[in-house]
Amino acid sequence: MVLPRRSPLMELVGNPSVLGVLGMDAGPGDLSELLKEDVENTVIVVDDFDTLTNDHSMNPRIEEHIKACRDHHGGVLVACGIDEVGGMYRGVVATARKTRTGLILAPRGSDDGSHFSARLPRSIGGPVPKGRAVQISTTGWTWVQVPKDQ
């Protein structure tokens, strides 16, 4: 996991599925070290990417991982504000957007789908329960509910 600032995901530290946690001071070598075991089947989770920015030294390695995992079970999960996504035309977010796969939590309107080249109905944008999201894939979109650990 790449966590550039405090995150609720820190609770997962110590879980056997988490290979490690990297912060703002980490570099591409640190990430490569964590990925050396099973690259194609490892998911990199990047929380608050808008804090990390496109200029961080780890980003080329993260982009490389997105491309390496196209035909495997691994990948990259990037969490970022929807407003910030619109202005990122290069780097990790742009590469991830090309997959046309994503999850938009509490979408504000049909235009939010355009970030993934998806057309959403105009009815999207009303109040939704916490954890409600639109899952977008190359085959379309569907409403999903993100489960809450109790």
Question: What are the residue ranges of the model-derived segments?
Answer:
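Phosphate-binding and hydrolysis-coupling loops of NTP-dependent motor/remodeling domains
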Residues: 12, 41-42, 79-80, 87-150
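P-loop NTPase catalytic phosphate-binding loop
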Residues: 1-97
